[in-house]
Amino acid sequence: MSDNMQPFDETLDDESLDAVDAETTEDCEDVEEFDPFEGMSDEELDALCDEDESLAGFGDVEPGFRSGFVALVGRPNAGKSTLLNACYGKKVAITSPVAQTTRRRMRAVVNRPGYQLVFVDTPGIHKPKDGLGSELNKSALFELNDVDVVAFLIDATKPIGRGDAWVAERVKNARSKKVLVLTKADEADPAQVMEQLKAAHELMEYDDEIVTSSVKNFNVDAFIETVAHFLPEGPRWFPEDMGTDASDETLVAEFVREKVLRRTRDEIPHSVGVICDALEQTKKVLRVHATIYVEREGQKGIIIGKGGEMIKHIGIDARRDLERIFGTQVFLELDVKVKAGWRDDEAQIRRFGYNAED
């Protein structure tokens, strides 16, 4: 147990891929391979070359300064995006009770005295049912050896099953340090937490462990300190004022999709994709146009709603988050279109930005 863990005084409210729990099959998502230089400006990359590929392009390298990447992995709905947001201090990754909410790799940078952490939110590892699911799984598994620490998240409220075991087999073969993170401790009682910890240790060995509750902000700082302990010495990979590597267009698409998921729930979630078509900043307002894509005409009707009421509410919900993120008034225009079978069309998957190699 991590030395950083605090006592929790409140009530703690299926070999092959085919063996994954039916629940896991429904609840899922993936992650993507990334290049730590991807978000750097041309000037920063040029500086690296000018310095004979030394670390000087990052500015002064502080003696003893530590930095690195931490992947948040686990079954769908294990609480990865919620923990990412809690670590960052504000919402950068979308969340919902719907399976497969996370589709894009999302990185959030956390700066603390003496170190910089780059958290990578990944899609839930699951049994894929279509081309999109396969890409998401590839993406998540690629991540395991490209980071310094793998945080394996397990939901404290759900019995550990063969789905967790399948994920654990992949995690334990990674070269990275492994930290067990038991999430949603506020929804479990103490006996349930202890039983989950015991079951988790039967899956694999860990370098450390911690019990958390993101919604109660319980042990979030302790989790950050726990994973930071395993970081190697190195430079700041990203500027101190950079919070996420996601583009404005990506943020728009993701937050609109989140509102669709929350408003429609189980009716059409896996068939929804969103593309931000245009962003135009004027003196007083940010004008945004985005298109919501579904696979069938019936799904389009659900999103539009009777008299346009559903699309209206989706737009209002999304606009509120976008105004908070961009710090300006937002005029959001939404369209809904049908793109049949897009989840099994590689070209369309790439168009939506969900392929593992991007």
Residue locations for each model-derived region?
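Conserved, well-folded catalytic cores of nucleic-acid-processing
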Residues: 90, 109-113, 143-150, 203-206, ...
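Solvent-exposed alpha-helical segments within well-ordered globular domains of core cellular machineries
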Residues: 85, 104, 108, 138-145, ...
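Conserved glycine(s) of the Walker
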Residues: 79, 219, 310
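P-loop NTP-binding site
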Residues: 248-358
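Catalytic P-loop NTPase motifs of RecA-like helicase/translocase cores
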Residues: 102, 125-127, 159-160, 188-189, ...
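Canonical P-loop GTPase G-domain recognition
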Residues: 177, 186-248
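Conserved C-terminal guanine-recognition region of P-loop GTPase G domains, centered on the G4
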Residues: 110-116, 135-209, 263, 280-285
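Conserved G1/Walker A P-loop phosphate-binding module
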Residues: 3-22, 26-149, 154, 292
